[in-house]
């Protein structure tokens, strides 16, 4: 792979400036609807990365770009989403990859879904959608969707590759989040996720080296969803000399917008006259989402303000919500797992405050959705969360892993803040920073740069 160093970047900028003023039409101009983008993601709908990839596809199509999405798990009849097909083969890839992880964990379920090997996957280079695309845009491609060999074939095809990082996996050996480990900077090894903390030449080291070899086979542009993840990624020896920039995920502000709170509660059969604290997660028992800190914060808040037992409740959106009943000091209203966007919007609009005490996170879609609906958010000062929540302006940023400060923030939003000002500021920030057009224009700059570099190389 030919890395993009500063000299090359300057050359590309000159080339782009020349094209901007040269009086002829080229096939990668920002306003040229012939640009074709293929976004590759494991699932169409399941998980935050799938939601973000779908929203980016819609944002690009609404901006005049022809964008399609290639997925393993197709769940709708959307004609802009294409399935890999061969369902039995795809399931085999998933099962084999999971078995290999399980084997290397000595058949322990600890960290089973915190590790990916990319040792099996599908060759997509023969698909018509791949051949038609000007740019291949990788999103979250783990759990048997693409192998490292698949990625190598994509790079060897000569097509420019843009890769949106929803976590650290593309820049590390095998982990999605480093949990304070920085061994990924220089080759991994002695991985804390492996039994006995691995060895100097363990699985994490071997996969890191394989990635290093694969990444040399073509040109890639990495995009992170948060500035925090960009800083983490730039530390990796895998991405040394490769372009890494930060562009947030988009959101459709015509769907996620403020609605009448009482009407939303009626539709969801939630109490109309209680203050509602909302907690959302695909799997609410996921330790990374900080449920233990949430439970502790609620206990502390209710102990200090016992009147909240009568006027406040907790709505929980996500799987396994029923497991939390009896563990919280306030009444719990499980909503379950919901995929319909309008119903999710109603859930946010029913809430008075949204709490996400994640211990490590990128740029959570859930905070963006809540803010778009005018709901102030409370979260820890971790990952990309402080980039979204402006402390005491549109929400509250609590000290990391501090249940007392989390409790203080929730109570402040509910009882001490200028709630209307917080709500309006939350909506305003989303419209300024995360609208479809704003994000699409930033990605068009990356696509144009990638295509200009390809043409310059020719």
Residue map of PLM features:
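Short hydrophobic beta-strand element within catalytic cores of glycosyltransferases
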Residues: 376-379
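Conserved acidic donor-binding segment of nucleotide-sugar-dependent glycosyltransferases
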Residues: 391-392, 396-403, 412-417
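A short, well-ordered alpha-helix in the C-terminal region of glycosyltransferases
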Residues: 405, 418-433, 439-445, 449
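Conserved donor-binding/catalytic core segment of Leloir-type glycosyltransferases
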Residues: 271-289, 295-298
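Aromatic "clamp/platform" in nucleotide-sugar-dependent glycosyltransferases that forms part
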Residues: 359
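A short, active-site helix/loop in glycosyltransferases that binds the activated sugar's phosphate group
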Residues: 172-176, 198-246, 251-255, 261
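Nucleotide-activated donor-binding/catalytic signature segment of Leloir-type glycosyltransferases, i.e.
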Residues: 305-312, 318-345
């Amino acid at each position: 792979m030919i890395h993009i160093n500063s000299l090359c970047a300057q050359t590309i900028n000159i080339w782009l400036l020349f094209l901007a003023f040269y009086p002829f039409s080229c096939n990668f101009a920002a306003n040229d609807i012939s640009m074709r983008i293929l976004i590759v993601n494991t699932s169409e709908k399941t998980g935050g990365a799938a939601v973000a990839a779908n929203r980016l596809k819609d944002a690009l199509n609404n901006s005049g770009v022809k964008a399609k999405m290639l997925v393993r798990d197709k769940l709708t009849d959307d004609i802009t989403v294409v399935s890999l097909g061969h369902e039995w083969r795809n399931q085999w890839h998933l099962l084999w990859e999971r078995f290999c992880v399980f084997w290397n964990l000595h058949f322990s379920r600890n960290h089973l879904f915190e590790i990916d090997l990319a040792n099996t996957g599908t060759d997509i280079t023969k698909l018509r959608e791949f051949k038609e695309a000007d740019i291949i845009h990788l999103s979250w491609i783990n759990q048997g969707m693409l192998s490292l060999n698949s990625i190598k074939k994509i790079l060897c095809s000569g097509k420019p590759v843009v890769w949106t990082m929803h976590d650290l996996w593309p820049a590390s050996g095998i982990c999605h989040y480093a949990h304070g480990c920085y061994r990924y900077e220089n080759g991994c090894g002695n991985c804390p996720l492996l039994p006995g903390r691995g060895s100097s030449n363990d699985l994490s080291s071997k996969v890191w080296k394989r990635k290093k070899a694969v990444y040399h086979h073509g040109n890639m542009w990495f995009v992170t969803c948060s500035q925090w993840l960009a800083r983490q990624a730039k530390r990796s020896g895998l991405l040394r000399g490769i372009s890494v920039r930060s562009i947030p995920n988009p959101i459709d502000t015509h769907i996620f917008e403020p609605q009448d709170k009482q009407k939303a509660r009626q539709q969801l059969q939630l109490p109309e006259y209680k203050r509602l604290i909302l907690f959302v997660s695909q799997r609410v028992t996921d330790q990374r989402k900080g449920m233990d800190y949430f439970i502790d914060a609620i206990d502390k808040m209710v102990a200090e303000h016992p009147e909240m037992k009568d006027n406040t409740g907790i709505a929980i959106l996500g799987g396994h919500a029923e497991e939390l009943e009896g563990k919280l000091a306030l009444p719990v209203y499980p909503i379950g797992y919901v995929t319909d966007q309008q119903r999710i919007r109603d859930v946010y609009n029913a809430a008075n405050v949204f709490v996400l005490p994640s211990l490590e996170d990128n740029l959570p879609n859930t905070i963006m959705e809540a803010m778009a609906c005018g709901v102030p958010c409370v979260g820890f000062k971790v990952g990309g969360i402080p980039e979204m929540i402006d402390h005491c302006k549109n929400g509250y940023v609590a000290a990391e892993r501090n249940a007392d400060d989390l409790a203080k923030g929730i109570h402040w939003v509910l009882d001490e803040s200028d709630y209307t000002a917080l709500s309006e500021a939350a909506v305003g920030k989303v419209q300024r920073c995360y609208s479809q057009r704003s994000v699409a224009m930033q990605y068009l700059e990356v696509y144009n740069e990638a295509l200009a570099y390809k043409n310059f190389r020719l």
